[in-house]
A protein has these predicted regions:
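Elongated, amphipathic alpha-helical interaction scaffolds
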Residues: 1-302
């Protein structure tokens, strides 16, 4: 295999590993709790450690397919959807998503992170999807992709969260996109809004069912300010420049995040991958410079 192809394959592999580590790190419940506190009105002003208790089961990371007809798993013969739906206090609701085809359907596009959250009333639930992007995509508009994802999550509820025409049982959905390497730190909430054009009739319905949150993270670590609480945490977690101890220090001292073995391990592994990617990029740059120099000398001699 050509050396340049080998390097490209290795770089792609490391990028993929980095992406998976980023998702795994974001998938820790305490990190998700900080995201919820800073993006969802009902959880504002709450202690993230309390919010952790509202996250049901374990979040699914790179498991649930986005593709039409694949988001839900097949029900077994004899399953009674009505009986399952009547038990609104079950904490295993997310298990009805399709987790069975991760190997059979390898290569399929999957949600980065998806999970259910029980609201403070103890009865209602919302569905949260978190997506991580290394930068704003160039091939497509990020909002368009977010709309596609959230529509898939909403439509997949039929047969899982509601049956027949009981659309009032649909759950509110938040699709939260974290976009790195932006020019500035930002936070946007994209949602439905009614506009009266003729008359004043009030149509019944829940306009808050679809919510897209886009979090822009700049390259620089933001100052320690209240408005940048979430941005500083995410920036520290996902930074390719900060050292392991600097990241852990911010997490522990500023955010009171318990540095358990698994989260400490994920931070270290991600930093190691970042270092490897930087070193390969540096070597590639040096090699390119050497080749350019050789070519110039050759032309000069001729």
């Amino acid at each position: 295999m050509d050396a340049s192809i080998k390097k490209t394959v290795r770089a792609s592999d490391k990028d993929a590993q980095y992406d998976e580590k980023a998702k795994k790190l974001l998938g820790h419940k305490i990190i998700l709790a900080y995201i919820l506190v800073n993006t969802i009105e009902e959880f504002r002003e709450m202690n993230p450690k309390e919010v952790v208790n509202y996250i049901e089961g374990e979040p699914y990371i790179s498991v649930i397919p986005v593709d039409s007809g694949m988001t839900n798993g097949k029900k077994k013969a004899g399953d009674n959807p009505r009986k399952e739906l009547e038990d609104t206090k079950t904490t295993e609701q997310v298990s009805r998503l399709n987790t069975e085809n991760s190997e059979i359907n390898e290569g399929m596009i999957r949600f980065d992170i998806i999970f259910y959250v029980r609201m403070k009333d103890g009865l209602t639930q919302i569905i949260i999807n978190v997506e991580a992007q290394k930068e704003e995509p160039r091939k497509y508009k990020i909002v368009n992709r977010a709309i596609f994802y959230i529509c898939r999550i909403v439509s997949s509820q039929k047969g899982r969260d509601f049956v027949n025409s009981e659309y009032d049982d649909m759950k509110r959905v938040y699709s939260i996109w974290i976009c790195m390497n932006m020019k500035e730190h930002s936070l946007s909430h994209i949602h439905l809004e009614e506009q009266q054009i003729i008359g004043s009739h009030k149509w019944k319905g829940d306009l808050d069912l679809l919510n897209i949150i886009i979090i822009g993270i700049a390259k620089n670590l933001p100052e320690k300010e209240e408005k940048y609480e979430l941005h500083r945490l995410l920036s520290a977690l996902l930074s390719s420049d900060l050292e392991v101890e600097d990241k852990l220090d911010i997490m522990e001292k500023e955010y009171d995040i318990p540095l358990e073995n698994d989260i400490r391990k994920d931070v270290k592994e991600m930093c190691n991958l970042s270092q490897g990617i930087r070193e390969e990029a540096f070597e590639e740059g040096q090699e390119y410079g050497y080749r350019e120099g050789q070519e110039k000398r050759r032309k000069t001699k001729n």
